[in-house]
Design a protein with these regions (language model features):
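Functional surface patches built around histidine and acidic residues
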Residues: 1-136
């Protein structure tokens, strides 16, 4: 686990939980304008993928591309309280998310060298990078 990636995940999960509800086209990779980061509406067509990829370098000393899997929509609460086991089970039940975790499909040439996760109520984020955390 990477302290820097955990920090990114905790920051984003807090933003997802606390932000106002965004446009319905904005998914869980979106960032509100309520923090010290570049906001974006991440849409299903991945047109704003750079917003996600650049967050590690924007928020930390980890000058690397980041990849994220999420549960929950900005500003919405499902009523389900997640823990690590429920979040992992949900991601494993989604072929696209499970592929990220297991480096399959699109991700088979990546080797995750750092990762971190955060959970608040019905929101969860896990971040991955092919670069190691530079912190000792």
């Amino acid at each position: 686990m990477s302290d820097l990636e955990i920090g990114i995940a905790e920051t984003h999960v807090r933003d997802l939980h606390d932000s106002p509800k965004l446009d319905p086209s904005c998914n869980g990779h979106s960032w509100s304008s309520k923090g010290a980061w570049t906001p974006c509406c991440y849409t299903p067509d991945h047109a704003q993928a750079k917003c996600m990829w650049d967050k590690p370098a924007e928020l930390t000393q980890l000058k690397a591309t980041g990849f994220e899997i999420t549960i929950g929509q900005p500003g919405e609460t499902s009523g389900v309280v997640l823990d690590s086991q429920k979040a992992i089970a949900a991601w494993q039940g989604s072929p696209l998310h499970n592929d990220v975790i297991l480096n399959r499909g699109t991700w088979e040439k990546m080797t995750w060298r750092s990762m971190g996760a955060g959970i608040i109520d019905s929101h969860a984020c896990a971040w991955f990078s092919d670069q190691p955390d530079p912190a000792p």
